[in-house]
Amino acid sequence: MKYLGSFFLATLIANIALGQMTDSPENKEITNYQINRNEYRNKLRGFWLGSCIANWTGLPTENARTDFPFFTDSDFGRDKYDYVLDQNPWGADDDTDIEYVYQHAIEKYNSYMLTGEQISAEWQKHIGLPKLWVSNLSALGQMQNGTIPPHTSVPENNPMWDMIDAQLTTEIFGAFAPGRPDIALEIGHLPVRTTAYLHSEWAAEFYIIMYSLSAIVDKSLSRKDQMIWMAEQARKRVPNWSYIADMYDFVKEAYDNNPDKDNWEKTRDEVAKRYQHSINAGYEYKYPWDSGINFAASIISLLYGEGDYKKTIRIGAMCGWDSDNPTATWGGLLGMLYGYKELQIQFNKTDFADGYDIARTRFNMPIPLDNFTDMSERGIDIINDIVVNAMGGSIEGDNWIIPQMSSEITQASVPETLVSWHTIEDNDPKWKYEGFVSLNENWNASGATLAKGYANCTAEFNFTGTAMQYYAYRSPRGGVVKILIDGVSYGDFSLEDHSGIHGQYYVKIFEKLDLTYGTHSIQIVGDANDTEKTIDMLSIIEDPDSKE
């Protein structure tokens, strides 16, 4: 097993090739896919509508049940939790709005291969607080301070690298590469790596692959079998040592062996016991917005939903944890598979709103109130470019002629890697506070808690390890803290920031990477001014074998 502790090792792994596709025999005949652009335009409208219905259906239960007792099917229905169908316009949320920003960025730069600098520029212009969380928020703060993707996702810079974020912000890259998951992975790689790394990266790629394959899935199969085929293809991408692979395999086996395919709750409860209440496959549950637990939950709704839009979204909304995210992912995929018109039939509703209010969550967009029809038309223009210039295909009348992938999807070629950084929250009982108080419901902060203090506040934490980092919230109200390690002062550090009225979360204020393995202490001492001092979290390396 490879241990990952340093920035340099992280960068080495980050730059390993995508593991695109295995070489095929030279004499293998390459056939073409023919995909009708008018039909695909309908599918893109279905993607946007399906994502929004599912997103807003899942939002009321988001983080409402993150442990036993969970919701069940009996909690869903009229006068309970129910499908959300009547928004006008549809409100943007983080499950759709960052994908919208990526589409805008591709249009703006006239390039489907966005660079790290372009991603950073568009994030800083359009994406920000208050509607931003965990890894997305950590990545934005780094970009504001000069770090460029993919370095915004490595564990040394982003303690939220293993959260769900990329799973809800990058599916659109699969939609942009119909029938060619290899191309989808290429164009989506840097957007994924803006916020995700290793396991969370492969969870996001799993969804991207399924979105891409939805354009060429065998139409003679039942919807259930179509979903299973796409999922099995996506599973090939994930290294067997990853907990994402273990979660897919566990849920798939539980589904296959369950004689009552309506009893999805049984598998959900088994997932909670295996991954939340125990440590398995290298996964240790941290937060209800973990990549891992929500990926497992998504596979439950995927399999038990059996390709039925309503059933899949209902299960996703009731499954628990960060429930609006898997629902939005599958709502978008099934919306593409069905197409806009079939979604209308599903709900016996022909008057869905077409408007999309991106200004609800994102700033400075050229079209603050957009609509699915135009968004889909612009998506077709992007795909035209990708088909010709990335796939080597052509446009013939109303059809794309797309060369078939020359080989099968293969596993990401990354050796088994252990990320050694371990999070210590500000509400950990081992902290010794004088003048600091850990406050709940700080939803933008790590673990939704944030310790605050003012004049002459002090904090001390003892830990065993070889490296540590101190993360804090900086704002216009921020003061100055002195950092001492084992009684030795390392200077004064400002927590003042004027990048925006909402400040910056997940800011790495200080790090010490060359400690001798053993027990150490960090002291954080506020100055005498009545300004705000904060502690969001520590990140430490405990394992002596991971010493840098």
Walk through the language-model features, giving the residues of each.
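Glycan-recognition surfaces in beta-rich domains, encompassing non-catalytic CBMs
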Residues: I409-E548
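Mature, well-folded catalytic/scaffold domains that follow N-terminal targeting or propeptide regions
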Residues: L44-R45, V101, I119, N145, ...
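Accessory "access/gating" subregions that flank catalytic or transport cores
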Residues: I35, Q144, T152-W161, T170-G179, ...
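Active-site cavity-forming subdomains of large catalytic enzyme subunits
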Residues: R41, L49, G91, I98, ...
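Bacterial N-terminal signal peptides
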Residues: S6-N15
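Catalytic phosphate/nucleotide-handling subdomain of diverse soluble enzymes
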Residues: I53, T57, A64, F68-F76, ...
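Acidic, carboxylate-rich catalytic segments that either coordinate divalent cations
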Residues: Y248, K252-E284, Y340-S420
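Active-site-surrounding "flap" and adjacent substrate/cofactor-binding loops of secreted or lumenal enzymes
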Residues: L59-Y100, E117-W123, I127-P130
